[in-house]
Structures are given as structure tokens and as C-alpha cells.
A protein has these predicted regions:
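Extracellular/periplasmic catalytic domains that process cell-envelope and extracellular macromolecules
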Residues: 21-25, 43, 67-69, 121-122, ...
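Short, structured active-site-proximal loop/turn typified by the sulfatase FGly-forming signature C/S-X-P-X-R
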Residues: 39-84
Length: 220
């Protein structure tokens, strides 16, 4: 089953070419709903996503090859294709390292390139990660200022509330870049197929989570 990644950039930030005062007024939240096919909003009730599309940009999918979770998410973090950043699949053997990469037990030595949270931290901009691929281990000796080890049992609404809480932290520890990963509707799509009613129901649930996040963020 080929599933692609839906990614939302919910706010804007510039890391260079701006004064420190301007930089501290800007935020970006990158939310990936894994396996979110580009046609899902046309087939499910997604008023929040629809409203964002009207004021932003909606694009066709542009996956890296292979179009699976870990290579694509690390490509988004680094701006590199999988053959340049090292994660060429969710599970693979690397002869140069004589080691096997597994999603359930990833090895830090596989992660090449510079993820965007490292770029931010180098420039004095705190970053946070909620389950984003590559953030659980130091890369080039760095991690996001705030990060969470993956735990699929954490309710989606709690994840949204955590991101809002991060954006309310005191300025000296507040992240201005948040990378936020949700493992659905990929998981349900693999179990029930992407065209199933269960998958579309999950898409609608995620739209409600996004609406909850926007409501909490706007009132904070």
C-alpha cells in the first residue's frame, strides 16, 4: 500500500536575514499526519483543513523515494533525499556500518545531514519535537531543546495541548520551531486499506484535533 505524508506548516519563521527582535516574534509549527493522502479532504469531512487550504497552499504529494515514513520525515527535517541523509528505508542493512536499522530500535549513527532543529538551535532559536523522526537521539551532538520519545498511547488532544503549552513557555525557553508527528491515518490505512470508512473516520478525527489545536492556540 502506498501512503503519502500530509504536512501542514501552521505559521511562519525566518532563521536568517532578520534581526533578533523580529526573530523572536515568529513561530512555525510543522505537523505531519503520516499516510495522509492528498485526496482525503475531498472524500471526508475536514472543515479545518479546508479552511487552512483557502488561506494557504494545497499541493499534490511530493514524496521522496521510497515513499515510507522514516525516509520521508527525515527528508523533511534535513532537506536531503534519503540516499544523501542515510535513512533509505524503515528497515535496512547498511554494509558500511555493518548494522541493521530498525524503526523500533533506531541507531543514531545512521542519521546524516543536519536536521532543521539543529539549524535553529545553532542560531539561538529553541526547537521542540513531538515524535519527529530523528529527534530522539543526538545528531552532531545536538537535539531539540524539547523532545518526546515516541508513545502511540498519548491521546491526540493531549499532544495538541502539549504543543500549545510549549508555545506559552517563558520566552527564554519557548520553542519557536515545533516539529509534530502523528502516526495516523497511516496505521489505520495499513490495517483497513486507505479507501476504507475506518480510515476516513480517522481523517475526520484528526481534523477535529487540528481544530482543537487552532482554537487553543488562538485563545492562548
Amino acid at each position: 500500500v502506498s501512503l503519502f505524508i500530509g504536512c501542514l506548516v501552521l505559521a511562519g519563521i525566518l532563521f536568517s536575514g532578520c534581526s533578533s527582535s523580529k526573530r523572536h516574534d515568529r513561530y512555525v509549527v510543522v505537523l505531519s499526519m503520516d499516510g495522509f493522502r492528498s485526496d482525503y479532504p475531498d472524500r471526508a469531512y475536514t472543515p479545518t483543513l479546508d479552511s487552512l487550504a483557502k488561506v494557504g497552499i494545497r499541493a499534490a504529494f511530493r514524496p521522496s523515494f521510497p515513499s515510507v515514513t522514516f525516509p520521508n520525515h527525515y527528508s523533511m527535517a534535513t532537506g536531503l533525499h534519503p540516499d544523501h541523509h542515510g535513512l533509505v528505508n524503515n528497515f535496512f542493512y547498511a554494509s558500511d556500518l555493518d548494522s541493521i536499522y530498525r524503526m523500533a530500535d533506531p541507531t543514531p549513527g545512521f542519521y546524516g545531514g543536519e536536521p532543521i532543529w539543529n539549524t535553529a538551535e545553532k542560531q539561538g532559536v529553541h526547537a521542540a519535537s513531538f515524535f519527529w523522526v530523528g529527534s530522539e537521539y543526538p545528531i552532531q551532538g545536538r537535539q531539540p531543546f524539547i523532545w518526546k520519545p515516541f508513545d502511540k498511547k498519548v491521546p491526540y488532544s493531549d499532544r495538541a495541548d502539549s504543543v500549545v503549552a510549549w508555545l506559552q513557555l517563558p520566552e527564554d525557553i519557548r520553542p519557536h520551531l515545533v516539529m509534530w508527528y502523528i502516526e495516523e491515518p497511516d496505521a489505520i490505512g495499513h490495517i483497513c486499506t486507505p479507501d476504507s470508512s475506518a480510515t476516513l473516520e480517522k481523517v475526520e478525527e484528526l481534523d477535529r484535533v487540528l481544530n482543537h489545536f487552532r482554537s487553543e492556540e488562538h485563545t492562548s
